[in-house]
A protein has these predicted regions:
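Mature-chain termini and adjacent capping regions
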Residues: 1-252
Length: 252
């Protein structure tokens, strides 16, 4: 940043102009920033209150890529090296934007990133929008002290829309567990809004909870108080049978 108000004794600093932060695994920038050395929740808290963007260089490691399919990356090509985008053995970055961004060190080896307001996340075969999202990174105990680790969980809340190649998912909330390899979509607590997955191949699934499995083009639909789960299959093609079985055509 070009200017800022620094208070070393209080362990804080702030500024209204744009600030860039570069770490081992991410690059963040935004306006109207505030830094705290220590808070009740963690250490080295940085807040951007306007026009924020953060790029995670290691991304989600292809979590949303279907098996036996080509990568349909929605990454911003300007943020990655051209050769990297062509190599399947390289991870593509995950880029997130929001009105508000906050990140800090929490507990030991963990880092939390919170984004709120007009949130969008783009990555390898992934485009996600929602009102609020929280990312938790967990570092390997044997890793470098500078590293923030890898994405462990992702919690998206409010008007969640997840777009992948040939599939769109909608929910009130979504919880992604990278270690377990599953994403859980949930409807609203009052049951008025259900989770929904629309797939070009097998149709539409609706339920109180839908579970997506890493690398698989499948969904497990769970019903609840709002009713039984529902699956709408694509139209069945004409199989060639006559409308009236056994009816013979009359000769002219």
């Amino acid at each position: 940043t070009k200017t800022g108000n620094f208070k070393p004794k209080n362990g804080e600093a702030c500024g209204s102009e744009r600030m860039d932060v570069t770490a081992d695994c991410f690059h963040a920038k935004g306006d109207n920033w505030h830094w705290f050395e220590k808070t009740e929740l963690g250490l080295n808290q940085i807040i951007f209150k306007h026009d924020t963007m953060i790029t995670f260089s290691r991304g989600l490691d292809g979590f949303f890529v279907f098996e036996n399919s080509k990568s349909d990356s929605n990454c911003l090509l300007g943020d990655i090296d051209g050769n990297t985008s062509r190599r399947s053995d390289q991870q593509l970055p995950t880029v997130a934007e929001a009105d508000y961004l906050e990140f800090m060190s929490v507990e030991e080896n963990n880092h939390r990133f919170l984004l709120e307001g007009n949130v969008s996340v783009e990555g390898n075969n992934l485009y996600l929008t929602c009102d609020k999202i929280e990312l938790l990174f967990v570092k390997d105990v044997n890793g470098s002290s500078r590293q923030i680790g890898k994405i462990n969980t992702m919690e998206a809340i409010g008007n969640v829309m997840l777009r992948q190649g040939g599939r769109k998912s909608y929910a009130n909330e979504m919880t992604l567990s990278v270690p377990e390899g599953v994403a859980e979509l949930r409807g609203s607590p009052d049951g008025k809004t259900l989770a929904r997955v629309v797939d070009e191949e097998w149709g539409e699934a609706v339920g109180e909870k839908i579970i997506l499995v890493k690398g698989k083009r499948m969904a497990k639909v769970v019903g609840g108080k709002s009713g039984r789960p529902r699956v709408v299959l694509p139209p069945i093609p004409n199989l060639g049978f006559d409308k009236i079985s056994g009816q013979k055509k009359s000769k002219p």
